Amino acid sequence: MPITHEQPNGFHSKQLNGSGIAKAKAMPYPSDLLSHFVKQHLELESYKNGQEIEIDGYSLSISAVSAAARYNAPVILRDSSTIRDRLEKARSVIVEKIEGSKSVYGVSTGFGGSADTRTSNTLALGNALLQHQHSGVLPSTTNTLSVLPLLDPIASTSMPESWVRGAILIRINSLIRGHSGVRWELIAKMVELLQANITPLVPLRGSISASGDLSPLSYVAGTLMGNPSIRVFDGPAAFGARQIVSSVKALEEHNITPISLLAKEHLGILNGTAFSASVASLVLSDVTHLAMLAQVCTAMGTEVLLGERMNYAPFIHAVARPHPGQTEAARTIWDLLSGSKLAHGHEEEVTIDQDQGELRQDRYPLRTAPQFLGPQIEDILSALNTVTLECNSTTDNPLIDGETGDIHHGGNFQAMSVSNAMEKTRLSLHHIGKLLFAQCAELVHPDMNRGLPPSLAATDPSINYHGKGIDIGIAAYVSELGYLANPVSTHIQSAELHNQAVNSLALISARATINSLEVLSLLTSSYLYMLCQAYDLRALQADFRQGLAEIVQEELRAHFSAHIESLDESPLFDKVISSMYKELNHTTTMDAVPRMVKVAGASTSLLVDFFMANQTSDAMSVAALTALPKFRETVALRAAAKLVALREEYLLGARGPAPASAWLGRTRPIYEFIRVTLGIRMHGTENLGVFQQGLGVQDVTIGQNVSLIHEAIRDGKMRGVVVGLFA
C-alpha cells in the first residue's frame, strides 16, 4: 500500500512506494484565475515583508520565484535529515560507480553526440564541459564606446539579473531533490550567491533548451568555482547601475570561498531547464495580473460605453454555456459592475417605435468578452500548473536513484512542457490585447461610443485630438502582439552532431513571451488612461444634461408662457429635451457654439407641431412661432456657456481630482488610484486655453501620463489595487 506523506508546509503531498522512492505530485493550485491571483499576491507580499523562502525540492511556487528573483527575498534550505540523507545516498552512488570504473554518462563519457569517448579523469571532464559551454557573446568592456551602438550593449547581449536569480533558485530546488548526485555543500554555495546578491553575467542567447539550458547555467557554475573570466553583477544598486566585476573579486568581497566541483557536479548544474522555467515563472507572475486587469478594463469599458451588465448574466454563461474560463470572466465582470450608475443594470422591454434607430445590444468587444477571455484564462491556468510543476521537478540526466543505486539515462532536461506553456500564454496575451484594442477603438470613435467626443477630447474637437495618438499607438501594440504570438517551437533545428535533433527552444519562447507581456502592458496602460478620461467626460455630460434641462425649462416658460400656461407643459418639455439629448449624441464632432445651435434647433419641429395643434387662434400660433428663433438662440448661447463653464470646472480642478467617483461601483478604486494616487488629471487644460502658455507648461505629455500607469503595472502597485477590488 502506498504511504501518503504531507510536507510540513502543507503545499505538497508525495507518495512513497514500497522501496521508499518519492513520487512527485503536482502542487494544488486554485481552479480559477481570481483565486490564484489573490493567493499569489498575498504570498508575494509575505515574502517581500521578510518571510523566508524555504527550499525543499517540492513546494517552490511562482510567487516565491518572483520574490527571490525580483525583490531579493531571503532564501534558505530546509536542512532536514531526510533531505541530507537523500543527497548523500545519491552522491554515494556516483562515488561507487567511479571507484568501480563503471561507465556513466557525463562522469566517464563525453557529452551528447560525443558520448562515445571515455575518460577516468572526471574533474578534467567537468572542466571541459564548462569550457565549451562558456561560448556566449557578452560585451568585452563596460567602458564608453567610440561609436554609438544600435542597441544597449549590456541589455542586448545579457540576461536581466532577475532571470538569472530565478534560475539559480529553481536549479537549487531541482538539485535538493537528490536525483542529481551533487553534494549539500554545492547547493548551499548556490544559496550563498543569492544571499550575497552576486548575479552571474549570462549571455542572452545561445540556449536551445534541449539538454536543458546548458550555456546559461555554465556561467552559474563558473561563478561558483571562481572562474576569473566569468563576470558578475555586484554591489548596491541604490546609487546607479550595479558593477560588473570578475566572479573572483565578487566572491572575495563577500567572503565566499569558491567551491571545487566534483565528478558529475558540473553536469548536475548545467543539465536542467532552470532558465526556461525562471523566465516562464516571471512571465506568468505578471500574466495573471494582466489577465485580471483585462476583466477590470472590460467592466470599466462597459460603464463608459453605457453598456449592459446583462451581457455577463449568469444564465448566459453558468447555465447556457458553462466553460469554466467563460463563466469566471462573466462572474468577475458582473460583480465589478455592482453599484455602477453608468452600466445598465437591467434590459427593459421597449416597443419598436421607442428604440427606433438605437443599437439594440452592445457590440462584440463588450458583449462577447467572457466568451473571448474565457479560453485565455483556461490556457493561462494550464500554463501556471505546468510551469509550477517544472519548478518542482528534477530536470537532469542521468538521474540517480539513491535507494536502489540505479542510474537512469533519460531526457528530463527536454523543456517542451515549458515551450508549450509559453506558446499558449503568448497567444493568450495577443487575444487579450486584441479584445482591449477593439474596446478602446470603439471608445474613441464618435459613431460608436454613445455620445462621447471624438478621441475623447474634453474641449472643442477642432483643436483637440487627444486620443488619436493613443489610437494609433495601440494599433501598433496589437500588431506586434500578433507577430509575437507566432510559435517559436516550429523553428526547431537539429543541433550538436544531430544528437539534439529535437529540442524545445523553451528559453527563446519564454523570452518572446516576456516581450508580449511588455507590449500588452503598454496597451493596457493606454486603455486605462482613456477609460479614466471617458469616466470624467460621462460625469461632465451628466452635469451638462442637467444644466441643459434647467435652461430649456426656463426658456420655454420665458418665451412661451402665454401659450402654455393653461396646458400641461411636462409632455412638451420631455419631448423637447429628449430631442436635444439625441442631437447631443449626433453632434460630438462639433465645437461648442455651433454644436449648441444645432442642439437647440432640434426642438423646432416639435414646437411648431405643438403650437399648431394646441393654439385656439391663428394669431396665437403666429405669436408662438415668432418666438421660436429667439428661444433657439437663447438656449444655444446659454448651453454653450454652460458647457464651457463645466469644462473649466472639470479641467481646472474645481470638481476635485476624481469627479466621476460618484458614478462608479466596484471599479472606483482603479479610477481613483490613477486620478488621485498617480496624480493623472483629466486631459484638456492646454486645449482649453488654446495653448496660450505653450506645450508642456500646464500639463505633462499624454505619454508621460500613460507611462505612470505602465510603471504602476510593472512595479506591482496596480496589482495591489486590483486585488483590493475582490477583498
From Swiss-Prot:
Name this polypeptide is given: Phenylalanine ammonia-lyase str11
PTM-bearing positions, type 2,3-didehydroalanine (Ser): S211
Provenance organism: Strobilurus tenacellus
Free-text biotechnology note from the record: The structure of strobilurin A was used for the development of the major class of beta-methoxyacrylate agricultural fungicides since its beta-methoxyacrylate toxophore targets the Qo site of complex III of the mitochondrial electron transport chain and prevents adenosine triphosphate synthesis. Compounds such as azoxystrobin (Syngenta) and Kresoxim methyl (BASF) are among the most widely used fungicides worldwide. This class of antifungals are used as effective treatments against a broad range of destructive fungal plant pathogens and make significant contributions to food security.
Gene: str11
NCBIfam families for this protein: phe_am_lyase
A Gene Ontology cellular-component term: cytoplasm
Lineage, opening ranks: Eukaryota, Fungi, Dikarya, Basidiomycota, Agaricomycotina
PTM entry text: Contains an active site 4-methylidene-imidazol-5-one (MIO), which is formed autocatalytically by cyclization and dehydration of residues Ala-Ser-Gly.
Catalytic activity: L-phenylalanine = (E)-cinnamate + NH4(+)
Tree of life domain: Eukaryota
Active site: Y105 (proton donor/acceptor)
